[in-house]
Curated annotation (Swiss-Prot):
Keyword Isomerase: yes
Reaction(s) catalysed by this chain's protein: [protein]-peptidylproline (omega=180) = [protein]-peptidylproline (omega=0)
Annotated PROSITE patterns: PPIC_PPIASE_2 (PS50198), WW_DOMAIN_1 (PS01159), WW_DOMAIN_2 (PS50020)
Domain WW: 7-41
Source species taxonomy: Eukaryota, Fungi, Dikarya, Ascomycota, Pezizomycotina
Keywords, ordered alphabetically: Isomerase, Rotamase
Gene: ssp-1
Class of this enzyme: isomerase
UniProt GO BP: regulation of macromolecule metabolic process; regulation of primary metabolic process
Annotated ranges, domain PpiC: 71-182
Annotated Gene Ontology cellular component terms: cytosol; nucleus
Function noted in UniProt: Site-specific PPIase with respect to the amino acid N-terminal to the proline residue. Peptides with glutamate, phosphoserine, or phosphothreonine in the -1 position are the best substrates. It is not only able to isomerize small peptides but is also active in protein folding.
Record-given protein name: Peptidyl-prolyl cis-trans isomerase ssp-1
């Protein structure tokens, strides 16, 4: 919620931020209406200063980075191929996974070659091929710290620099390729 005096907006109007469009908009708390353009009666000079201070891409990106990346945590995406010896041999793609560990390894090696050749990204491949429910988010696992993941996965992930992709990592869940995002 924004302060009317600081924003230069008429009474009952405030600046809000659209999550879907990632843009600021104007909301009238009395009438519950919103609009993309400032309402009539706005002190445009005050609004410009307010918008530059709180809604410029640089200040907003800095705030998001400070808020979103917790201390000591990293963000990764992964592509998981399960096999019949996996901890839970089922996924959103298959109710019962019957492939052997060797078949899973061969499959993941093929994916690894495609990613390394640049023909497809890990995220694009994860959308259709990963056995993890994170597939719908391009394999993005969000932020995690030490002790949050299986040790083998965690060790491989923390060894990566942002933008790097691991070799094949074997855990109780299955076989993974991991990409460090942040």
């Amino acid at each position: 919620m924004s302060n009317t005096i600081e924003t230069g907006l008429p009474e009952d109007w405030e600046v809000r931020h659209s999550q879907s469009k990632n843009l600021p908009y104007y909301f009238n708390s009395a009438t519950k209406t919103s609009r993309w353009e400032p309402p009539s009666g706005t002190d445009v000079d005050k609004l410009k200063i307010y918008m530059a201070k709180y809604h410029s891409p640089t200040s907003q990106q800095q705030q998001q980075q400070q808020q979103q990346q917790p201390q000591g945590k990293i963000r990764c995406a992964h592509l998981l191929v399960k096999h019949n010896q996996s901890r839970r041999p089922s996924s959103w793609r298959e109710s019962e996974i019957t492939r052997t560990k060797q078949e899973a390894l061969t499959t993941l090696q093929g994916f690894e070659q495609r990613i390394k050749s640049g023909s497809i990204s890990l995220g694009e491949l994860a959308l259709t091929e990963s056995d993890c429910s994170s597939a719908r988010k391009r394999g993005d696992l969000g932020y995690f710290g030490r002790g949050d993941m299986q040790k083998e996965f965690e060790d491989a992930a923390f060894a990566l620099k942002p933008g790097e992709i691991s070799g094949i990592v074997d855990t109780a869940s299955g076989l993974h390729l991991i990409e460090r995002l942040e």
